[in-house]
Structure formats: structure tokens, C-alpha cells
């Protein structure tokens, strides 16, 4: 039997934040997250451990993820911790004339010519996804998210969790929509990221299921 602790409903939260790496002058995406990690650790890795906050790679080489090192009960304390790490990353990237860019999707990135799949650890998994789905689309390579991972210990707790958040889920995109432009053009959607995400796994829709909203 696993010794891994099983958390109860709302006992803790896991937080993940994704950022693009871009040129400071042109805002063009830069697939140099591996160089960022190498500059910090001395080696190309898939994770950088920094106490309460860790950095990790994503599917594409221009996106870096900041995440809680372990589930936390103290969400407010991570506001300053994440901000501190963003400043550290920007200081390191400045040596390459690069910086982090927030928002949900890059407004003028061309994913069909600028996508670079992560070529290092776990590349065989990413390459398989790329072979199946062609990950050059906006729904794969131009997609930055914030994840709040909420635990549940059993089916009853999952039912309560779903009941508690089902009214909030459709509201979140309306409050946080920040991707009205793709390919340098207004799309007609305030949350173009969500619209792209809706279609990115259409070849195997069972992998995603229904999207809310």
C-alpha cells in the first residue's frame, strides 16, 4: 500500500502558473527554457527545485511552469513567493535579452512556424502527442494556463467538490479572459484560448471529455 498522504476536500491546493519566454524588444517567443534551466542549475533539466516553488518545462520550449513544490494550505503566502520567482527568472533571462510574458495566449505567435517541442527528458511522450495531434496549433503550443488542483478522498467528496465549483467554473473564463487576439487579429472571442482548447483534441475527444463552459 502506498504511503502517499490522501488529502481531504479543500484541505490543500496545488497551484501551477504557465508563462511564455519572449524577446524583450520584439516579444517574439523564444524556445530557450532549457537554456534558462541550464543557466540556473548548470545542466539541462526538466525541473528546477527552489524550495516552496519549483520550475518545470512544458510541451513546448518557450513555456515555463511555476508550481507549488507540494500541496499547500496557505494559498495567500504564494502570491509573494511566485512573484519572487518571476523576478528571479526575469533577471536570468535578461542576460539573453528575454523575459516572461503573461496572459493566456500570445497575440501574434505563428504556432505553425514557431513551435519547438521540448527536445529533452520526456520528449518521447511529447513527440507521440505531436504525431497524433500535430501540436503546432494554438490549442497546444500557444496556451498558457493557471491550474488550481483540488483534492478529494472519495466519490462522496468528489460529488461535493463538483457541486461547490460547478456554478463558479463558467464564470472564471468571463472574469479572466485575456486572449482576444490570435495571429495578430481579433478573433471575436474574449477567451480565444478556451475556444482553441475546445478543439485541440478532436482526434481523440475521449481524452478531454466535455469542456466547461
Locate predicted features:
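Terminal catalytic/cofactor-binding subdomain
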Residues: 1-136, 142
Amino acid at each position: 500500500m502506498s504511503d502517499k498522504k490522501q488529502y481531504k476536500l479543500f484541505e490543500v491546493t496545488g497551484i501551477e502558473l504557465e508563462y511564455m519566454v519572449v524577446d524583450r524588444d520584439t516579444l517574439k517567443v523564444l524556445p530557450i527554457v532549457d537554456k534558462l534551466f541550464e543557466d540556473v542549475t548548470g545542466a539541462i533539466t526538466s525541473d528546477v527545485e527552489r524550495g516552496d516553488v519549483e520550475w518545470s518545462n512544458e510541451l513546448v520550449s518557450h513555456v515555463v511552469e511555476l508550481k507549488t513544490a507540494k500541496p499547500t494550505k496557505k494559498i495567500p503566502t504564494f502570491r509573494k513567493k511566485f512573484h519572487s520567482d518571476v523576478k528571479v527568472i526575469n533577471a536570468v533571462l535578461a542576460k539573453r535579452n528575454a523575459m516572461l510574458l503573461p496572459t493566456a495566449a500570445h497575440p501574434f505567435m505563428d504556432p505553425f512556424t514557431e513551435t519547438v517541442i521540448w527536445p529533452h527528458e520526456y520528449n518521447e511522450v511529447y513527440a507521440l502527442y505531436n504525431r497524433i495531434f500535430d501540436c503546432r496549433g494554438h490549442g497546444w503550443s500557444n496556451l498558457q494556463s493557471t491550474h488550481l488542483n483540488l483534492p478529494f478522498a472519495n466519490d462522496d467528496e468528489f460529488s461535493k467538490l463538483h457541486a461547490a465549483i460547478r456554478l463558479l467554473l463558467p464564470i472564471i473564463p468571463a472574469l479572466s479572459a485575456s486572449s482576444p487576439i490570435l495571429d495578430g487579429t481579433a478573433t471575436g472571442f474574449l477567451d480565444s484560448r478556451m475556444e482553441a482548447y475546445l478543439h485541440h483534441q478532436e482526434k481523440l475527444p475521449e481524452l478531454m471529455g466535455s469542456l466547461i463552459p
